Amino acid sequence: MLGLLGLTGPLTQAHADPGATPQAYPIGGRILGLETICGDCTVEKFTSECTGLLEAPVFDRAGILWLVGILKGVIWRVTPDGHCTVGVQLPPEIKFPAGLRFAQDGTLYGVAMGSGLFSVDLSSAKATLIANGATLGGFPDGGFHGLDDIFIDHAGGMYFTDAAGSSVFNPVGQLFYRDAGGNISRIISGGLMFPNGVVLSPDEKMLYIDEWGANRILAVPVIAPGIINKGFGYVFATLNGGHGPDSMTADSSGNIYAAHYGSSEIVVFAPNGDYFGAIHLPAGAGSDPTNAAFHNGYLYITEMAQHTIWRVKTKIPGIMLYGGQ
């Protein structure tokens, strides 16, 4: 969706064999192997102190990890030694937080499945609901069904997925964009099967949206901030097994990393859709990774079923985000 540094006892580790035959994603595509991504891909347990269905890991410039406990209604604060404390207790009007991102000015923004878009002033630990799709930033039809994930571009705008109520049999999921001035537009009005993660390529010319309900990742060209070319959108990758892709991140080379919920793995794709392989969590780690975030040479992975954060050393730095690497 800890305690690696300063704790006694052996690390919990798993090794992905770069020479092993991984699942074929996509069918007919090239399989590149993980050596250039994470070497032997040793996965270490970082912490299991945070609870409440973990999601949305983001790092600030000081190296503090922030993430949500969905059921607890909190934003956890995790220090570099893996100690987890409540950083922000969300107010009652912000229900089921699901995604977080830092803006350029250091403000933390988030989306909540039961509420809408919110901002957080970390200096005061105060969270404020800023758009709910109805009375705040409203649309005549009520706007939001239930927001799931968020990504902030270099223009200060925010893409966020609207997933609640959508599925493979009810493809009513949406995508919204809030520009730097606070204006919200609906840029995909239905047709998505539980849109979950959303991320931009490093040059911000391609937007990736994954559909949990369809077990696939879509790609659509970006014309300008908040303006996409749906006529040239396509299926970027189709996953096998599990339930579906949850949230995503990207590295500085444009490779896409998707948390494959139900499969205990992070799947990695090249910008052209070729499949590198799957970074597997260790046996017994839980099957439900929800998200991943780069920091200081590692990819940190949240796993929901056992409220644990794992990490794997990577060879390519992550996409530059406002919180810092």
Where are these regions (language model features)?
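Beta-propeller domains
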Residues: 66-89
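A short beta-strand motif characteristic of beta-propeller blades
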Residues: 42-48, 83-90, 126-140, 183-189, ...
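A short helix->beta-strand "capping" segment at the edge of beta-propeller domains
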Residues: 20-52, 233
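A short loop-to-beta-strand structural motif that recurs across blades of beta-propeller domains
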Residues: 74-76, 116-118, 173-176, 216-218, ...
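Glycine/small-residue-rich hydrophobic helix-like segments
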Residues: 221-290
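Short loop/turn segments that connect beta-strands within beta-propeller blades
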Residues: 79-83, 121-125, 178-182, 221-225, ...
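Short loop/turn segments immediately following the C-termini of beta-strands
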Residues: 70, 112-113, 163-165, 212, ...
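Beta-rich, blade/repeat-based domains predominating
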Residues: 47-65, 70, 91-116, 135-158, ...
